[in-house]
C-alpha cells in the first residue's frame, strides 16, 4: 500500500544485522508484516519510532506476505505505559497478533485499540475495565455475536436474580446449577453495557472473555500473561514494604 496510514507496532524482532521484522496493526489494512531495512543501524532515525504504543504514520510496498517499510513517522510520543499498564498493553498487542489474520481490514477495531491504550495510559486505578471492554469489542469484530439481554432457551429477557449457563455459539440458558460456566443476570447486564461497577462483575466478565477467546487462541498460552504473573508477586511485595 503506497499511501500513508495510521499504525501501531505490535511486536518487533531483529532481522539480519541492521533490519527489523515488524508486526504492525494499521487502520486501513489491518495486521501487516513488514521489514524495516536498516532500522537497527546506528544512523537510522527509525529506531526510536518503531516501538509499541507509539502512534505512527507509515508507508509500505510489496506484494508478498512480507512487505517493505518505505517511510515511518511518529505522530506523537509513545503513550506512557508502565508497570501493570505496560503488561496490559503487551497483552492486547499479543492478543491481536494471535487472533487477527494478516491484511484483513479492521478500521473500527483500530480505534477500539487506540481508545484502550489511551485509557490504560490515563488510568490511576485498575486496568481491568479497559481490558474487558477491548476484549468484548474484539470478539464483536471477529463475528462472535452474543446476546446478553435475552435467554437463548426461552427468549425472555434475563433476570438480574437468575443464573444462566453459557453454551458456546448458542448463548445463555437458565440454569439451577452454579459453577464456573454460569453467570447471574446482573453479570450479563454488565457485559451488555460494558460497565463493571464492582469486583464481582469484573471477575465475571474476565471469566466470560477467557471462555469466548479460547477457541481463537487454542492451547498455546499467552506469553504476556506469564510476564504479568511474574510481575504481580514483585508488585505485591513492594506495596507491603511501602
UniProtKB/Swiss-Prot annotation:
Classification via Gene3D superfamilies: Nucleic acid-binding proteins, Recombination protein O, C-terminal domain
* A Pfam cross-reference name: RecO_N
| One GO biological process term | double-strand break repair
Which UniProt keywords are present, listed alphabetically?
DNA damage, DNA recombination, DNA repair
Whether DNA damage counts among this entry's keywords is yes
Q: What is this protein called?
A: DNA repair protein RecO
Give me the Gene Ontology terms describing cellular component: bacterial nucleoid
InterPro entries from the entry? ARFGAP/RecO (IPR037278), DNA_rep/recomb_RecO_N (IPR022572), NA-bd_OB-fold (IPR012340), RecO (IPR003717), RecO_C (IPR042242)
Q: What's its job?
A: Involved in DNA repair and RecF pathway recombination.
Name the gene for this chain.
recO
The subunit field of the Swiss-Prot or TrEMBL record says: Monomer.
Q: What family does the Swiss-Prot or TrEMBL record give for this protein?
A: Belongs to the RecO family.
